[in-house]
Amino acid sequence: MKILLVRLSSMGDLIHTLPAIEDLARQCPDVELHWLCEAGFADIARLHPFVKKIHVMKWRQWRKHLFQAETWQEIGRLKQALRQEAFDFVLDSQGLIKSACFAKMAKFPIYGLDKNSAREGLAALAYAKTYTVPKGKNAVWRNRELFAQVFGYAMPETQVFGLTVPEAGRLKNLEQPYYAALHATSRDSKLWPVENWRALLQKLNE
């Protein structure tokens, strides 16, 4: 079985999808999984060894140059590449109108969340098959539950991210214990005030 996963962005959304992929790798090891995501987050998708191939889109760049021929040429090449893969189906785990539009590029049946479960209910109109996943749960649980329903297995009790971190990206010889502060975000509305960071770090250092 050959599947295209559509989870375009942002960084946190891709990370929250990794435990579902680990479940799939353990429960259905014969699945060939491809992943379509925003180019800027492709390295996150590459961290999981079960993902055989990454297909990248550049919507954050394309939307600024929609009237340029080069933009549509790149979109056309992406369409062609996806359609040549002959997927059994496309799984849109993001549940947005944008992700549904990119999922349709592949021209294969799309599976996804139903209108009451998706973040944008209209996205479900593009799906050949839909699944109900409660909104009240956290993102990791919802992704794992969606995958479990789509591929027909019971969600494992243990949550595992299954990452393979390249040697060059590993931090070594750090004194224990240590803290990692992740401050970056692609949206200003998610930024935390500097004084809050200072207060947190001072508290941790006590």
Model-derived features: positions:
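Catalytic machinery of carbohydrate-active enzymes
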Residues: 1-206
